[in-house]
C-alpha cells in the first residue's frame, strides 16, 4: 500500500507553522493577502508559502526523496490589516538554499513567479522582503555607491542637480547635444537621456553619445566642474547594451544609464558588473514600475523593487518626489529612500518597513527625485531628501522663459541658497520661498 492518500489536501497542514522561529539566514517576506470568500486566512497564507517554495497541489511520491522540513517555505505569522475587511499580512520564511546566489532574477522567479495567479486568492501583494546578509553578500551591489561617486565627481555637502532633456523624442543628435551643453554650462551636474531614448531613426545612439560627450567636455572646461550625462545604454539585446556601455567608456564619460525593469535584472546585473570593472557610474530608471507597484492590493511595493536594485546594482535610482503629495506617502517614500542609502534600517511599520534590514557594507544608492518638480520645490526637496540625493528638473529647467542655461542657473542658485540657509539653521519649511527670493536678486 502507498504511504499517502491521493487527492487535494490542505496546505495549512504542512505550510502553516506559527511556532516556527525564523533563522538569521532565512529570506522573509510580508504578503498582503486578500483571500476569496470562504478561504480561511491560514490556508491562504500557507498556500502562498507552498506555491512559492516546494509545494504543489497534491502529494507526490517524490516528496519522499527530499527533506521538506529543510526546504519548504513556512507561513509563520498572520495578522489582519486594520481597517480592511478580509485582508491579512502573511509572513513567510524561505530557507536560504531555495535561491541561486547573486541572482535577483531567481529570487523573484521563486517568490513572485507563480503564486500571484493563485485561485484561492482574490489579490496578493508583496509588501517587503528581508534579505539576510548571508544572501546579500553574494551580490556585488551598486558599482560604486554614494561616497565613491562624490569622490569621483568632487561634489560634497549638497544634493546633485540633473535635468532630463526634452522634448524627449524627435531632436537630432546635434541639437540634443546643444541642449545638454547649455544645461551643464548653466550649473547642473548632470543631464539625462529620457528612458525611451534608445536608438531611434531620428537619432541613433552613436551620434547621440558623441555629441553629448562633446557637450560634457566643453562644459567641464568652461566651468571647472566635473559634468555628466546619463547615456542610456538600454537596448534590445544584452550584447547591444554592452556595446553601448563600452563605447561610452571609450569616450571617457563618467556615467551611463539603464532601464532596469524593462531591461530586466539579468541585463542590469551584467551592466553593473561592467560599470564597476570600468569605473562607470550607473544611473537607473524605473520605467514600468507602476505596472507592478501602483495597486494597493496586488503586485509588489516599490520598496521591494528598490531593495532588488541595490543588490543587482545601480548608483542612482528614481524614487518619486514626495512634494505636494500626502503626508503618509512622504513617510513611506522616506522609508525606502533609507533602504537605498543606509547600512542598517530598523523595522518601522508606520513607514512601511516590515523587517529590520541589515545591508552590512553594501554600498548605497542615491535616490533621484524627478518628475513634475520645479525651482520652488527646492526648499522642500532639500529638507526631505537631504544631501545624498539627485534632484532632477526637466521641464523645470528647459521651461525657463529665457532658455535652458538660465533655467539651469536658477536651479543651481536656488539649491546653493537652500543648502546655505539650512546650514545657517534657518527653517526651510517656513522661510524657503523667502530664501529663494533673496537669492534671485543677486543671481546674474
Swiss-Prot record:
Cited InterPro entries: RuBisCO (IPR033966), RuBisCo_large_chain_AS (IPR020878), RuBisCO_lsu_C (IPR000685), RuBisCO_lsu_C_sf (IPR036376), RuBisCO_lsu_fd_N (IPR017443), RuBisCO_lsu_N_sf (IPR036422), RuBisCO_lsuI (IPR020888)
Site (Transition state stabilizer): 325
GO BP term (any one): photorespiration
Cofactor dependency: Mg(2+)
UniProt: Mg(2+) binding residues: 192, 194-195
Database matches in Gene3D superfamilies: Ribulose bisphosphate carboxylase, large subunit, C-terminal domain, RuBisCO large subunit, N-terminal domain
Record note on modification: The disulfide bond which can form in the large chain dimeric partners within the hexadecamer appears to be associated with oxidative stress and protein turnover.
GO molecular function, one term: monooxygenase activity
Residue positions of the active site: 166, 285
Protein EC: 4.1.1.39
Cofactor mode of binding and number, as noted: Binds 1 Mg(2+) ion per subunit.
Assembly and binders: Heterohexadecamer of 8 large chains and 8 small chains; disulfide-linked. The disulfide link is formed within the large subunit homodimers.
Miscellaneous comment in the UniProt entry for this protein: The basic functional RuBisCO is composed of a large chain homodimer in a 'head-to-tail' conformation. In form I RuBisCO this homodimer is arranged in a barrel-like tetramer with the small subunits forming a tetrameric 'cap' on each end of the 'barrel'.
Record-linked PANTHER family: RIBULOSE BISPHOSPHATE CARBOXYLASE, RIBULOSE BISPHOSPHATE CARBOXYLASE LARGE CHAIN
Biological role: RuBisCO catalyzes two reactions: the carboxylation of D-ribulose 1,5-bisphosphate, the primary event in carbon dioxide fixation, as well as the oxidative fragmentation of the pentose substrate in the photorespiration process. Both reactions occur simultaneously and in competition at the same active site.
Protein name: Ribulose bisphosphate carboxylase large chain
Biological source species: Ginkgo biloba (Ginkgo)
Amino acid at each position: 500500500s502507498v504511504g499517502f492518500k491521493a487527492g487535494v489536501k490542505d496546505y495549512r497542514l504542512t505550510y502553516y507553522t506559527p511556532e516556527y522561529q525564523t533563522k538569521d539566514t532565512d529570506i522573509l517576506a510580508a504578503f498582503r493577502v486578500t483571500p476569496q470568500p470562504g478561504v480561511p486566512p491560514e490556508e491562504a497564507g500557507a498556500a502562498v508559502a507552498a506555491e512559492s517554495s516546494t509545494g504543489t497541489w497534491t502529494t507526490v511520491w517524490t516528496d519522499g526523496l527530499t527533506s521538506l522540513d529543510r526546504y519548504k517555505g513556512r507561513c509563520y505569522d498572520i495578522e489582519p490589516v486594520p481597517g480592511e475587511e478580509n485582508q491579512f499580512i502573511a509572513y513567510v520564511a524561505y530557507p536560504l538554499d531555495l535561491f541561486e546566489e547573486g541572482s535577483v532574477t531567481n529570487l523573484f522567479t521563486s517568490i513572485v513567479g507563480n503564486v500571484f495567479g493563485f485561485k484561492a486568492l482574490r489579490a496578493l501583494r508583496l509588501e517587503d522582503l528581508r534579505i539576510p546578509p548571508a544572501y546579500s553578500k553574494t551580490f556585488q551591489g551598486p558599482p560604486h555607491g554614494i561616497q565613491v561617486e562624490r569622490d569621483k565627481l568632487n561634489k560634497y555637502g549638497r544634493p546633485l542637480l540633473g535635468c532630463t532633456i526634452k522634448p524627449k523624442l524627435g531632436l537630432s543628435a546635434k541639437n540634443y547635444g546643444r541642449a545638454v551643453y547649455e544645461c551643464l554650462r548653466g550649473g547642473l551636474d548632470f543631464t539625462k537621456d529620457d528612458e525611451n531614448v534608445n536608438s531611434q531613426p531620428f537619432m541613433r545612439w552613436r551620434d547621440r553619445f558623441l555629441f553629448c560627450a562633446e557637450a560634457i567636455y566643453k562644459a567641464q572646461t568652461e566651468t571647472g566642474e566635473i559634468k555628466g550625462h546619463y547615456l542610456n545604454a538600454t537596448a534590445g539585446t544584452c550584447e547591444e547594451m554592452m556595446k553601448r556601455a563600452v563605447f561610452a567608456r571609450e569616450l571617457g564619460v563618467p556615467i551611463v544609464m539603464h532601464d532596469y525593469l524593462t531591461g530586466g535584472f539579468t541585463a542590469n546585473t551584467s551592466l553593473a558588473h561592467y560599470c564597476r570593472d570600468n569605473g562607470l557610474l550607473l544611473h537607473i530608471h524605473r520605467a514600468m514600475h507602476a505596472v507592478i507597484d501602483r495597486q494597493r492590493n496586488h503586485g509588489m511595493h516599490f520598496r521591494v523593487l528598490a531593495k532588488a536594485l541595490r543588490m543587482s546594482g545601480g548608483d542612482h535610482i528614481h524614487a518619486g518626489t514626495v512634494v505636494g503629495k500626502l503626508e503618509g506617502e512622504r513617510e513611506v517614500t522616506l522609508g525606502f529612500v533609507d533602504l537605498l542609502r543606509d547600512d542598517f534600517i530598523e523595522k518601522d511599520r508606520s513607514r512601511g518597513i516590515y523587517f529590520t534590514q541589515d545591508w552590512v557594507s553594501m554600498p548605497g544608492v542615491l535616490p533621484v527625485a524627478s518628475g513634475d518638480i520645479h525651482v520652488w520645490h527646492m526648499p522642500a526637496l532639500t529638507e526631505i531628501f537631504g544631501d545624498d540625493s539627485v534632484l532632477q528638473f526637466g521641464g523645470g529647467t528647459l521651461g525657463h522663459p529665457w532658455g535652458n542655461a538660465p533655467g539651469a542657473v536658477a536651479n543651481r542658485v536656488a539649491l546653493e541658497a537652500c543648502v546655505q540657509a539650512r546650514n545657517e539653521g534657518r527653517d526651510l519649511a517656513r522661510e524657503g520661498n523667502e530664501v529663494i527670493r533673496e537669492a534671485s536678486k543677486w543671481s546674474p
